[in-house]
Every structure is written in C-alpha cells, then in structure tokens.
Amino acid sequence: MTTGRAQLRQPFLFVGNHPCLDFINTQMIVRGNPTDLLGGCEDLVAWLVQAHMVDKVQATVVMTQWGHEDQEQLFEQGITFRRTLRDMAARIVARKSIPDSAIVSINKILSRCPGYPQLVRKKGGYTRQFQSQAAQKDGLLAPLAEAASDLLCSGKWSLVKKCGNPACILYFYDTTKNHTRNWCSMQLCGNRKKVAAHYQRKRNNPTL
C-alpha cells in the first residue's frame, strides 16, 4: 500500500463547507481519472490536522509512537468510514433514507472515543468542536463522527449538494445567501462549464 505524504498528486481540497463533505472529497476526479488523495495513514493524519480535526501534538503521537500495524488499522478505519459518509451524502442528495448501518458506524466510533467539546472562535462567531484524545486508535476519527451526527441532526439536508458537473464527484454544503450554488468551485468546474457552454452557443449560432 502506498504511504507517505510525498505520494500525493493533488493538494487537499476544502470546498465542502462541512467536515464530512470535505473528507468525502479526498476522492476526486483528476483529468478524467478517479484519484484518492489518501494513500496511507500519514495522508489521513495530515488531512485531519489541516481540517482541524486533531492537533499537531496528536498527529506526532500517531506518526512517531504508534506501530505500523496500528497506523494501518487507523487508515483502514478511515477509508471504511469515508465510504459510509459518501453513501450517506449520496442518499441525502437523492432524498433517500439513511440506512441503519450508517448510524451504527457513526455510533461505534463515538462510543469508543474519549474526548470533550470545546468552544472555538470562528469568523462571525463561535462553534462547538469535539477535541479527541489520541490515546485510542478510534479517537482520531471522533471529530468526523461528531460532524456526521451534527449533519444528520442539525443540518439542512436540502443544502447538501453534489457538484453540477456530471463528471465531478465532489459534494458541498450550500451556504450561499440564496442557496443557488451549483459547483464544487468555479475554478475546478464552474468556469469550465461556462466556457464550454459559451463555445457550444457560438458553434450553434456563429453570429453571437
């Protein structure tokens, strides 16, 4: 299995406006090819740090004090949970019910994770953030499980959307004023689709 941050071909994207969706978006399409930004435990931990799910001290404990087997187990748990979250997001977008298996997966992680909530300042106010403790292997995924439960309990499901580009697999939580966001980002998909549409119109009507 490929491990190590150096193997990443693309930087992490944080365009989902929600931790669960940003985690799902570590799988993306690059030049028409499915690409996984998580190649091993080091990548997973790096993402958790960048997403403010764990701090650098916890990350150092995992990468310097955990054995290879424990690191691999954490990575596999993360990938499995990501698969659960992707299915959950797809069902929300399709207006389908969430399967009990997803709830079981979320609760399983929450039940095994020591930690505590903290009040964190953010732009325009405050938010509550779960601070996990790295003593337990499952503890590193606790903030993601907490975010998933928050999305299901407090989020507006109608604002969970998949990018309007059929070739894109990224999800986002629409926080725009009128909730009219269609693209994962203008840079990745929005501008390209607009340019393509303009080109097609010019072909169909050269006088434009």
Which positions does each model-derived feature cover?
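Short helix-coil boundary/hinge micro-motifs
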Residues: 1-159
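Cys/His-clustered metal-coordination modules, chiefly Zn-binding fingers
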Residues: 127-208
